[in-house]
Curated annotation (Swiss-Prot):
Record GO cellular component, one term: spindle pole
List of residues binding ATP: L106, G107, K108, G109, K110, F111, G112, N113, V114, K129
Record text on subunit structure and interactions: Component of the chromosomal passenger complex (CPC).
Enzyme class: transferase
Name of one Pfam family that matches: Pkinase
Record's signal peptide: none
EC number from the UniProt entry: 2.7.11.1
Name the UniProt record assigns to this protein: Aurora kinase B-B
Gene source species: Xenopus laevis
Key words of the record: ATP-binding, Cell cycle, Cell division, Centromere, Chromosome, Chromosome partition, Cytoplasm, Cytoskeleton, Kinase, Mitosis, Nucleotide-binding, Nucleus, Phosphoprotein, Serine/threonine-protein kinase, Transferase
Active-site residues (renumbered): D223
Record-level GO BP terms: cellular response to UV; cleavage furrow formation; midbody abscission; mitotic cytokinesis checkpoint signaling; mitotic spindle midzone assembly; mitotic spindle organization; negative regulation of B cell apoptotic process; negative regulation of cytokinesis
Phylogenetic classification of the source organism: Eukaryota, Metazoa, Chordata, Craniata, Vertebrata
Catalytic reactions of this protein: L-seryl-[protein] + ATP = O-phospho-L-seryl-[protein] + ADP + H(+); L-threonyl-[protein] + ATP = O-phospho-L-threonyl-[protein] + ADP + H(+)
Regulation of protein activity: Kinase activity is stimulated by cell-cycle specific phosphorylation.
Gene this chain is encoded by: aurkb-b
Length: 368
């Protein structure tokens, strides 16, 4: 979940039978790429007063990743790692908005705002996302928020934004998130136009490692794109929006979610899909990193659809053979033919160009 609120109505739904108002909208609409980008505002304000808190338990402690022996890759310092794990070490307690000093807004969206915040008792710095229940109910996207909390709060990976905790009152829901000091990757891409091979390969290795971690836990993201990525203290990539994600034990879904430019053929054609949709998205993302725009970008939705299902892939002349090889192996019509995430991390172009800050932490089995 990025700092810009990115929950939008869709035909996506979970099969929950909850008796609350958390209902799914009945009208199905084609997913579109909607950018909600606003500049930071350097004011000091508090979003609320007189609030009632719900008991919320803090997540278990996270151990910082060990140093990597791979040349050119440096482990994150313990000072930064401790910043990211400090909340997990605090005693269990109740939270209210009065427990926080609220700083400048980090982002604004349709359903609320995100603020830089400091927990008063232990001086923890974080991003506090404040969402209005009335707006969530009005748009029928409460199920997405519930799903996002359920998924993101259990993920522990250096390239996935931490959700430490959450609490709520009568009108608002508050998400306690890891603060990503370097901000939004989308803005960085806009600023530079496109990234060089070293930065693109580094991001691809980090993304592949994080997605492999998710897939091992049967979590499909389904909406990887620059708008849903942030950058940490060392500029490392962090997946930050799980609004369209699903925890699917069967790893097979049929709803069409995500962003038009990034939708794979099987989702456009309404076929059953699995975790390999994220492989397609990774290929689109790599292309956009290097070129500055998605590979199937067209004036109309129908033309974009046509180009995607036909895999009408065109490379500009300045791309290297290695990068084109990686992208071509990810953007395959048949999901089973797409390069696995391990293959992305071991691809010669990635290994030759990546300057990753954090070592891989993917494990082949669940932690006990």
């Amino acid at each position: 979940m990025s700092y810009k609120e990115n929950l939008i109505p869709s035909s996506c739904s979970s099969s929950s039978s909850s008796s609350s108002k958390f209902a799914t909208p009945s009208s199905a609409t084609a997913a579109q790429r909607v950018l909600r980008k606003q500049p930071y505002v350097s004011i000091f304000t508090t979003p609320s007063d007189n609030l009632l808190a719900q008991r919320a338990q803090l997540a278990p402690r996270v151990t910082p990743a060990a140093s990597s022996s791979v040349p050119g890759r440096v482990a994150l310092g313990t000072d930064v790692a401790s910043h990211n794990t400090a909340l997990a070490e605090a005693p269990k307690r109740k939270f209210t908005i009065d427990d926080f000093d609220i700083g400048r807004p980090l982002g604004k969206g349709k359903f609320g705002n995100v603020y830089l915040a400091r927990e008063k008792q232990n001086k923890f710095i974080m991003a506090l996302k404040v969402l209005f229940k009335s707006q969530l109910e009005k748009e029928g996207v409460e199920h997405q928020l519930r799903r996002e909390i359920e998924i993101q709060s259990h993920l522990r990976h250096p390239n996935i934004l931490r959700m430490y905790n959450y609490f709520h009152d009568r009108k608002r829901i508050y998400l306690m998130l890891e603060f990503a000091p370097r901000g939004e990757l989308y803005k960085e891409l806009q600023k530079h136009g496109r990234f060089d091979e070293q930065r693109s390969a580094t991001f691809m290795e980090e993304l592949a490692d994080a997605l492999q971690y998710c897939h091992e836990r049967k979590v499909i993201h389904r909406d990887i794109k620059p708008e849903n990525l942030l950058m940490g203290y060392k500029g490392e990539l962090k997946i930050a929006d799980f609004g369209w994600s699903v925890h699917a034990p069967s790893l097979r879904r049929r709803t069409m979610c995500g962003t038009l430019d990034y939708l794979p053929p099987e989702m456009i054609e309404g076929k059953t899909h699995d975790e390999k949709v994220d492989l397609w998205c990774a290929g689109v993302l790599c292309y956009e990193f290097l070129v500055g725009m998605p590979p199937f970008d067209s004036p109309s939705h129908s033309e974009t659809h046509r180009r995607i299902v036909n895999v009408d892939l065109k490379f500009p002349p300045f791309l290297s053979e290695g990068s084109k090889d990686l992208i071509s192996k990810l953007l395959r019509y048949h999901p089973a033919q797409r390069l696995p995430l391990k293959g992305v991390m071991e691809h010669p172009w990635v290994k030759a160009n990546s300057r990753r800050v954090l070592p891989p932490v993917y494990q082949s089995s669940h932690p006990k």
